[in-house]
């Protein structure tokens, strides 16, 4: 029920080939390989052969383990692979997270990345998303009083909701690495500085740092041109408060 409430698909972990067959009969859309099954390349290959997305936790995996697991998927034509950075401790200590592994795995193996988190906070998933994670695994418990093997590091539904909200905010603030001249940026130019006429000037007056100054708003000539203006004569009468322009300089 919970996956449908948060807009995600049900994902069930498989443990052997017969489990894969059963999950296929049930219409399972995604296969999840746990950290402790990372070395079972035959299981990985069989699950991958079904053509469904593969999510693989990496808690105990060496680089060789990951290479073999990815190759097992590729060998049956499955390239839809997501590696989850995972610390195989329950609960997992924050200082062992090593989340910089996430962008490294993405670049090193050319796959999608995510995080499988067993820590006691929502910090790891939020940071992981900022580092490029597209999948987050976090345990949920409806009532801690019920107990259970993972109750000590599972989130309540309310805690999970707060984590999802925070992750969505991270996705918004990350944006893109470029410098657009969008409407917001252009409107903010009014708070920058530019060159304006600071004193009334007559034709032939010499430009100095007193009669042409860098002030707000930012709609005048860029301050970088001040050095090109100093010592030059103006070719017309100018009033205090006018925007300075290069065309006002005598040739």
PLM segments and residue spans:
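Single conserved hydrophobic/aromatic residue that forms the stacking wall/gate
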Residues: 1-7, 11-12
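Short beta-strand/loop segments at the ligand-binding rim of alpha/beta enzyme cores
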Residues: 8-9, 28-30, 53, 108-114
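Glycine-rich beta-to-alpha transition loops that act as phosphate-gripper elements at the mouths
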Residues: 13-17, 37-38, 59-60, 115-121
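Alpha/beta enzyme core
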Residues: 17-29, 37-53, 62, 68-83
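Conserved, mostly hydrophobic/aromatic
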Residues: 23, 57, 83, 132, ...
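Short beta->alpha connector loops at strand-helix junctions that form conserved
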Residues: 32-35, 57-59, 139-140
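Catalytic alpha/beta core domains of metabolic enzymes, predominantly
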Residues: 63-176
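Conserved SET/PR domain catalytic loop and adjacent active-site segment
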Residues: 172-251
């Amino acid at each position: 029920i919970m996956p449908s409430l948060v807009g995600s698909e049900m994902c069930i972990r498989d443990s052997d080939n017969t489990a894969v067959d059963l999950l296929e009969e049930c219409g399972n859309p995604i296969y999840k390989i746990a950290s402790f099954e990372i070395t079972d390349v035959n299981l990985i290959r069989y699950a991958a052969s079904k053509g469904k997305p593969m999510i693989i936790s990496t808690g105990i995996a060496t680089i060789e383990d990951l290479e073999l697991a990815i190759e097992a998927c590729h060998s049956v034509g499955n390239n839809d692979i997501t590696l989850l950075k995972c610390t195989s401790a329950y609960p997992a200590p924050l200082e062992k997270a090593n989340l910089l592994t996430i962008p490294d795995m993405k670049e090193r193996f050319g796959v999608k990345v995510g995080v499988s988190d067993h820590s006691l906070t929502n910090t790891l998933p939020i940071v992981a998303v900022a580092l490029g994670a597209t999948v987050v695994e976090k345990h949920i418990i409806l009532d801690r009083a019920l107990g259970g093997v993972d109750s000590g590091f599972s989130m309540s539904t309310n805690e999970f909701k707060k984590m999802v909200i925070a992750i969505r905010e991270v996705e918004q603030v990350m944006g893109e690495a470029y410098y657009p001249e969008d409407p917001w940026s252009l409107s903010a130019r009014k708070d920058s500085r530019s060159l304006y006429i600071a004193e009334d000037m007559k034709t032939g007056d010499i430009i100095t740092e007193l009669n042409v100054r860098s002030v707000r708003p930012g709609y005048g000539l860029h301050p970088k041109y001040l050095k090109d203006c100093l010592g030059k004569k103006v070719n017309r009468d100018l009033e205090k408060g006018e925007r300075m322009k290069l065309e006002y300089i005598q040739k």
